[in-house]
Amino acid sequence: MKKMIAILLSVLTVLCMCACSKDEPRTETKTDDYTPDYGELYYASGDTKFGIMDPAEEVLNALGEPVNGTFESDSCAYQGKDYFYYYDGFEVMVNDVDGVKRITGITVADDTVQTPQGLKIGMKLEDAQALLTGEYKQVGDVYKYTQGSTVLKLAVGDDGTLTAIEYAVAANDK
């Protein structure tokens, strides 16, 4: 009988604590006042233009079902998971940033697509640099262009051609 009373008291205590907690309804979203700050460093697929830190939900809806699937893994840079969406020629990475799922990475996967800036895997570095404005920072074989929240990374092979093109969060690029 004493065990039963102890269990009931424990359950009642938990219920009381839950009832007293503040769970305020969400009347606003953190995307209402969002303004992109990636300048000319954005990506586009069809009529859908998007960039780093854009709210992911509307972009993913506009892009449609990822033709090459999705993947998720534990995140090293953010709390929670990394979500990857694989489309023809490019990949989109999404993370939860301050309660909003945002685009945190865009990677050109192969030479079947071209960025809005005119960049394409396999093109000569000199040709790519002629298409981009602003200064860059070279770290080994990677050339980094930064505007606002975005860093555009161009990896170059031994033959002087682009081997990788990636848009990433500038704050994470240390």
Which residue ranges define each predicted feature?
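C-terminal motif of bacterial Sec signal peptides marking the signal peptidase cleavage site
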Residues: 15-19
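N-terminal, intrinsically disordered, polar/charged segments of Gram-positive cell-envelope systems
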Residues: 6, 22-63
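Positively charged n-region of N-terminal signal peptides that target proteins for export
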Residues: 1-4
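Short acidic DE-rich linear segments
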Residues: 24, 172-174
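A cross-family detector of function-defining hotspots
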Residues: 35, 45, 56-98, 120, ...
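Short, surface-exposed ligand-recognition loops at beta-strand->loop->(often short) alpha-helix junctions
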Residues: 48-52, 116-121
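A low-complexity, Ser/Thr/Gly/Pro-enriched, surface-exposed linker/loop concept
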Residues: 104, 108-115, 121
